[in-house]
Regions:
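Flavin (primarily FAD) cofactor-binding/catalytic cores of flavoenzymes
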Residues: 1-99, 106-302, 316-323
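Short, highly charged C-terminal tails/helix-capping segments
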Residues: 311-312
Length: 323
């Protein structure tokens, strides 16, 4: 198959096992690497389940596997749970955000003194892309290291009903959330012995579980991807990881940047471009990005650039709208 232009619209990449999960466990039925394929039968007979991660993926797994007498332990670096959506829409917040990560953090803290934090974060989300584009590489790294956990739990929220169910599980002891880092796992017959280091401590704690579920979410390090197409692109130099390793490096038009220059006719869209645009997973953001890319590809075809000389004269906005 030949094409004048190719757009990589792969969405979120499948999760990879976190450090601490050894090969023996990875190949065992006592471990679920991809929770999006998790079925209730996988947990049949399990009383104690370790969930690696504490975000929305963990919540989905815990609620779907919840049974009388079953206990869950959720382990994540910071032990933070997603916050909940409001039952009624809050008063909108409209003030602009500007500056580096520290400046924006101060502005958010000040804004939440007079407005519902949800409204503040909703407005911040719409400002995230231009803010990210204006930050230096050092500022982006600082955000990822220090502020991303807070961003994630406020940005990716629970429905009010799910929040009630999770807090009920916490209150009843069905669910325990721990802050720490998984250090090792050992298969022991029909159970798994796991060791983790609590946050701020050196000595590990051990526990025994009947099932371990990877709930760390979509793959966040492009070099770890087992997607054959991604591996081939990187191997042949058609593309390269972005400086933060979040996805593939692209220019402002979404073209992949190879070993030394943009690759004409090869584009990426969505989470693969997170290193360049950061907030690029919600439908409104994807729709806007798709429209921009469609217009660019159509214009390149009209002018004979990027090897796309014979593109049909279709309105790119109609393509994005599905008309």
């Amino acid at each position: 198959m030949q094409a004048e232009a190719v757009v990589l619209a792969l969405g979120n990449l499948e999760p990879a096992s976190p450090p601490g999960v050894d090969e023996a466990l990875r190949n065992s039925p006592l471990y679920v690497e991809n929770p999006w394929r998790l079925e209730a039968e996988a947990a049949e007979g399990a009383r104690d389940i370790l969930l690696i991660g504490a975000g929305l993926t963990m919540v989905d797994a815990a609620l779907s596997l919840r049974r009388p007498g079953r206990r869950f332990t959720a382990l994540s670096r910071h032990g933070l749970l997603p916050r909940a959506h409001a039952t009624v829409p809050p008063e909108p917040y409209v003030e602009a955000f500007a500056g580096g990560p520290s400046d924006v953090l101060k502005q958010v803290r000040q804004a939440t003194q007079t407005h519902d934090w949800r409204a503040v974060f909703d407005h911040l989300r719409h400002s995230a892309r231009p803010l990210w584009r204006s930050w230096t590489a050092v500022q982006r790294k600082r955000f990822l290291r220090h502020l991303r956990p807070l961003w994630d739990v406020h940005r990716h929220r629970l429905s009010p009903g799910s929040a009630r169910d999770i807090h009920s599980m916490l209150a009843s002891g069905e669910l325990t959330v721990l802050a720490g880092k998984l250090s090792e796992t050992t298969l022991d017959g029909r159970s798994v012995e796991a060791a983790w280091r609590p946050r701020g401590r050196r000595r590990a704690i051990r526990g025994r579980f009947d099932l371990v579920v990877n709930c760390t979410g979509p793959l966040g390090v492009i070099q770890q991807s087992r997607e054959p197409l991604i591996a081939d692109i990187l191997k042949k130099g058609y593309g390269r990881p972005d400086p933060l390793g979040l996805g593939l490096q692209v220019d402002g038009d979404g073209r992949l940047i190879g070993q030394d220059r943009p690759a004409d006719g090869l584009y990426a869209i969505g989470p693969l471009t997170r290193g360049a645009f950061w907030e690029i997973t919600a439908v409104p953001d994807l729709r806007a990005q798709a429209l921009d890319l469609a217009e660019h590809v159509a214009a390149a075809g009209a002018t004979g650039q990027s090897g796309a000389a014979d593109w049909p004269r279709t309105d790119p906005a109609a393509i994005v709208r599905g008309t």
